[in-house]
Amino acid sequence: MSEKIAIAISGAAGRMGRRLIALGSAEGNLKIAAAWDTPSHPDFGADSGQLAGVGSNGVPIRSITDDQTPVDVIIDFSTPAATDELIAQALKRRSALVYATTGAAAEQMEALRQAAKTIPVLWSPSMSMTVNLTMLLAQTAARALADKDADVEIIEKHHRFKADAPSGTALKFGRLIAEEMGIDGAVFGREGKTGARPHNQIGYHAVRIGDNPGEHTILFGLLGETIELTVKATNRDAYAVGALRCAEFLAGKPAGEIYTMNDVLNL
């Protein structure tokens, strides 16, 4: 696309929204055209550039239903409570949608799949490029260990403000590994007299601490040896940069199936 890609940030007043505005403002081929959040947010109405610490950009934080600014791509880092209206607005505007919110209900994911038939939609439980590369490594390990009676445990760490557990990324790791190894059992934390660990099970463990932006460790344990894959984000910019790359990728793409980070990274 020869002109700048017009971007709308949904959840613009939040921590991720501010980083998206700050980093997106520095991208030569992107333009922050709209910034949306709920009217109840204390920073509603503020200049989004000033809120993001990059100076006034003339784009105030507004409601998605009140702001009719035309945009090429919407990046959503809000909450599942906003998803239904978000999808409706994206369809109404014929805007591409990068959906980065976690914790969506099954019916909301189905609504995204239906929307993808009309507009370009990209969804990933993590916008981090290194997380998605680590998923590929985990799949490779799972495939190699599928018949070796390996135990699989997933440990994820996030900041104290994260509202869902385990993380969508941890669950995606688990789904990919389960498919490769034929595992259909799961346990979320353990306590008490649990007995011997069954092989046909993936264990999930969620840690909520401080301002940790995200860390995932995948353990494949055999008798006498263990593989440990760990991917860490050192700050939120890892997710913001990934989401902006997704927006650049999605602009101008045809509708059809939901795109993922694998498409962006050519995996």
Model-derived regions: residue spans:
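Residue-level detector of alpha-helix initiation sites
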Residues: G14-R15, A81, S128
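Rossmann-fold NAD(P) dinucleotide-binding segment
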Residues: T65-V73, F77-A100, A111
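Rossmann-fold NAD(P)-binding glycine/threonine-rich loop
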Residues: D84-A88, T101-W123, N132, L137-Q139
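C-terminal substrate-binding/catalytic lobe of Rossmann-fold NAD(P)-dependent oxidoreductases
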Residues: A6-D67, D149-L267
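Structural motif
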Residues: S10, F77-S78, A100-T101, S124, ...
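Rossmann-like NAD(P)H-binding beta-loop-alpha module
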Residues: L133-D149, A165
